[in-house]
């Protein structure tokens, strides 16, 4: 779709604060295979922050002065990855909607919520995993993930 709408896409990107895009789209948009270089080129297009999703390898948040890598949540069995990226973006947006300020730290927090939302998505076909999701399950898995992140950092 980028091939047919690149001019319009770049106009829209210029007006965004945060662009969430997958690694293949980032390469197509910037011509860069390296994720960090690609994200830096995206920042020059207008956004203050860029998140590049890396599928089962997690995601990376880049600003002009900072970088944050987040792994994916280690689910026991992936049933269907369809919709995981959209679930990530939706979970992130939902978390950011409850924040007073949108900044690097609040986006990092949102990425964790997005990662956990995506983890529920991939455990079932279609939206079935998300239909079973509630705030208690989400928060429980967020805490498990945070403890995992503390151990690996």
Predicted segments with their positions:
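Conserved phosphate-binding/catalytic region of the ribokinase-like
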Residues: 35-153
């Amino acid at each position: 779709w980028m091939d047919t709408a690149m001019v319009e896409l770049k106009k829209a990107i210029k007006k965004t604060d945060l662009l969430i895009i997958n690694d293949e789209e980032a390469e197509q948009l910037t011509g860069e295979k390296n994720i960090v270089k690609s994200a830096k080129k995206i920042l020059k297009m207008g956004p203050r922050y860029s998140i590049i999703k890396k599928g089962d390898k997690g995601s990376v948040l880049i600003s002009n002065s900072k970088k944050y890598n987040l792994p994916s949540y280690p689910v026991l069995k992936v049933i269907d990855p369809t919709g995981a990226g959209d679930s990530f973006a939706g979970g992130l947006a939902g978390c950011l909607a409850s924040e007073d300020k949108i900044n690097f730290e609040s986006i990092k927090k949102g990425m964790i919520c997005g990662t956990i939302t995506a983890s529920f998505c991939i455990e079932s076909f279609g939206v079935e995993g998300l239909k079973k999701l509630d705030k208690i399950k989400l928060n429980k898995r967020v805490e498990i993930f945070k403890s995992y992140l503390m151990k690996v950092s």
